[in-house]
């Protein structure tokens, strides 16, 4: 949504990354850990109390979010009523939006000065990497068009899954479904020796993010997850072959 808003109004969209985000969270519960190997302490201690969250702790993500939320609200932002990860601030008729997803932060707004001030405020509290203009976020590439539009695609992800499932050198086809073939469930005692479930899951992730054009094809093959046969695997590979020729397709 924030990408669409930024493009609609012609606002800049910048990206920041919080360095070791989870380590900023202050623990509110009593949590103890074993003394790390190689750490020498005065006294006979069997464990240590965690003051701050650490990676791998089940509370870490929640504590980090509470820490970020508390600080952003302290500098004048309000949490959106529609998205708890979106923060809004209005100053003298100008607004700035901050969206956080774990440790990725997107900032846009009607005033470059207000955006710069917000960045400065955030950097005084958290160590952050400023990537400037957002071009790649959460595995999605943002490609600007000459008319001011933006296309969101997952070319890198497509390359990754093609290689993962041994389809990186396959021949491209123009459609994700072979309409001349009708697939039916099977009651065979054996399944096809192929990573069918993993492949369909990978395609579902792509479908829900930026590739609605493969929704029918993925939904079709997902009907046969319980007992996939060779013809079902061929249908999955057909989708991969379609992706081979449409890597830059996405949401416009």
Predicted regions and their residues:
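Long, low-complexity, charge-biased intrinsically disordered regions
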Residues: 1-252
């Amino acid at each position: 949504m924030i990408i669409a808003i930024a493009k609609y109004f012609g606002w800049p969209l910048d990206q920041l990354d919080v360095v070791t985000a989870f380590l900023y969270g202050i623990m509110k519960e009593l949590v103890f850990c074993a003394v790390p190997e190689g750490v020498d302490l005065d006294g006979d201690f069997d464990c240590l109390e965690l003051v701050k969250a650490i990676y791998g702790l089940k509370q870490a993500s929640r504590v980090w979010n509470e820490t970020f939320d508390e600080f952003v609200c302290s500098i004048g932002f309000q949490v959106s009523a529609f998205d708890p990860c979106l923060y809004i601030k209005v100053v003298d008729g100008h607004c700035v939006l901050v969206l956080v997803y774990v440790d990725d932060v997107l900032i846009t707004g009607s005033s470059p000065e207000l955006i710069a001030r917000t960045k400065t405020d955030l950097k005084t509290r958290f160590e952050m990497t400023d990537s400037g203009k957002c071009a790649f976020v959460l595995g999605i590439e943002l490609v600007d068009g000459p008319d001011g539009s933006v296309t969101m695609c997952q070319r890198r992800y497509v390359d990754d899954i093609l290689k993962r499932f041994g389809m990186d050198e396959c021949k491209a086809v123009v459609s994700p479904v072979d309409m001349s073939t009708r697939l039916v469930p099977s009651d065979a005692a054996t399944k096809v020796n192929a990573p069918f479930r993993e492949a369909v899951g990978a395609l579902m992730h792509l479908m829900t993010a930026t590739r609605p054009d493969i929704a029918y094809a993925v939904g079709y093959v997902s009907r046969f997850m319980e007992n996939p046969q060779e013809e079902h695997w061929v249908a999955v590979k057909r989708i991969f072959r379609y992706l081979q020729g449409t890597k830059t397709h996405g949401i416009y």
